[in-house]
Amino acid sequence: MEKRISELDIPRTLEEACDPKHMALLIYDMQVGIVDQLPHGPEITRRVGNVLDAARDGGFPVFFSRHMSLPTELMGIFQIRQAMTWQQVDRIEDVKSPFPQGSAQWQIVPDLEPLPSEAVSDKIVMSAFEGTFLDFALRDQGIRSFAICGIATEVGIEPTVRQGADLGYVPVVIEDACGAGDEAAGERSLGVLRFAGDALFTDAATISALFYEATTST
């Protein structure tokens, strides 16, 4: 691990970033109403579940993001415009709140049910950091890097990775445990992140092995 003049550790490799004292797992929007929209949703759920099991076994902190939508009467400009686009309606009166708090589609899928020791952060925007407690909680835990997986790459994972990097974290994208609503758009998002140098990249099997390895090394 390289150091700068101030002796700040700079993780450069996946192994360096996966320090159990300084890494967390962030599971992005694995909700019933989102997973059900993707043909490969069950496969993404399985891979995310494997990573989650390994992180729990290795003692890594786990956070979930969960998208919620306000009642239509309280939606802002962004929420209304996005809902009109995604719901393919032309009139504001026809917009429906897609993920109201407490609804079936808002819930985390049962196979990934959070434990009492894990946190779920609700949000109304795409980045898991914007307007939530996530940054505060990670810093309180001494976290410097986070591994991210879930749905959808091109909608919320990319902005979460970019904002996380702007906040000083080292994001690790678990590529094959990230699902995209539009595969081409998802690949473009990964390409943008690679070009920017914001993140490290891995797959579910590799990072799961590192998580399990932390169990034997502690």
Give, region by region, the residue ranges found by the protein language model.
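Short, active-site-adjacent cap segments at secondary-structure transitions
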Residues: 33, 69-73, 156
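Von Willebrand factor
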Residues: 55-74
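Short beta-to-alpha linker loops that shape the active-site pocket of alpha/beta-hydrolase fold enzymes
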Residues: 31, 68, 177
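Short, contiguous, helix-prone interaction/anchoring segments in small proteins
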Residues: 22-54, 63
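Conserved protein kinase catalytic core
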Residues: 35, 72-73, 128, 182
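Glycine-rich loop at the start of a catalytic domain that most often binds anionic cofactors/ligands
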Residues: 74-81
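Active-site-adjacent betaalpha module
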Residues: 1-24, 50-58, 82, 86-218
